[in-house]
């Protein structure tokens, strides 16, 4: 998959930091763990060895995934974005039509998405429904919990805190 994907400059630095840590710290540590487990004898019945090999496979897979993401990243400086329409990087305040509660989301890339911090992936159902909308628009979002309707009450672009 060669498609570019958006990421903030801070998000890209975080991605690079994770990649560097995996390559230079975790990879070395797991090699040492495997060597130590080998010293315990018969590898066919060595649970420590098997666990270390599984962890190594996970780490190598994550390294490949992050390298691919880094190669495809389209770094976007949110502080230079503006406008009334919702796009990547927007901080969007909505009012739930049913409860009249305000909720704020930030539209980010897949690597930076974290619903506990109200950061939604640009590929998520809510972000897909919001893209291109502006203040005063109503959006219908279909989620696993059902359909929700919101009114867009504020759109702004500001730097993200990591």
UniProtKB/Swiss-Prot annotation:
Disulfide partners: none
Keyword DNA-binding in annotation: yes
InterPro entries: GreA/GreB_C_sf, TF_GreA/GreB_CS, Tscrpt_elong_fac_GreA, Tscrpt_elong_fac_GreA/B, Tscrpt_elong_fac_GreA/B_C, Tscrpt_elong_fac_GreA/B_fam, Tscrpt_elong_fac_GreA/B_N, Tscrpt_elong_fac_GreA/B_N_sf
Entry keywords, A to Z: Coiled coil, DNA-binding, Transcription, Transcription regulation
HAMAP family, per the entry: GreA_GreB
Pfam families assigned to the protein according to its UniProt record, in alphabetical order: GreA_GreB (PF01272), GreA_GreB_N (PF03449)
Biological function: Necessary for efficient RNA polymerase transcription elongation past template-encoded arresting sites. The arresting sites in DNA have the property of trapping a certain fraction of elongating RNA polymerases that pass through, resulting in locked ternary complexes. Cleavage of the nascent transcript by cleavage factors such as GreA or GreB allows the resumption of elongation from the new 3'terminus. GreA releases sequences of 2 to 3 nucleotides.
Organism of this sequence: Rickettsia canadensis (strain McKiel)
Name of the protein this chain belongs to: Transcription elongation factor GreA
Gene Ontology MF terms: DNA binding; RNA polymerase binding
SUPFAM superfamilies: FKBP-like, GreA transcript cleavage protein, N-terminal domain
Sequence similarity: Belongs to the GreA/GreB family.
Coiled coil: 45-75
One BP annotation, GO: regulation of DNA-templated transcription elongation
PROSITE patterns, per database record: GREAB_1, GREAB_2
């Amino acid at each position: 998959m060669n498609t570019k994907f958006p990421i903030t400059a801070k998000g890209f630095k975080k991605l690079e930091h994770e990649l560097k840590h995996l390559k230079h710290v975790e990879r070395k540590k797991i090699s040492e763990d495997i060597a130590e487990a080998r010293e315990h004898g018969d590898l066919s019945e060595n649970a420590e060895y098997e666990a270390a090999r599984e962890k190594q496979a996970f780490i190598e897979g994550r390294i490949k995934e992050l390298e691919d993401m880094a190669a495809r990243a389209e770094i976007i400086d949110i502080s230079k974005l503006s406008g009334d329409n919702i796009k990547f990087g927007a901080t969007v305040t909505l009012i739930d039509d049913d409860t009249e509660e305000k909720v704020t989301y930030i539209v980010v890339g897949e690597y930076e998405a974290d619903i506990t911090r109200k950061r939604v992936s640009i590929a998520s159902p809510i972000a897909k429904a919001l893209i291109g909308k502006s203040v005063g628009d109503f959006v219908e979002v279909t989620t696993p919990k059902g359909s929700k309707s919101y009114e867009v009450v504020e759109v702004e672009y500001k730097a993200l805190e990591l």
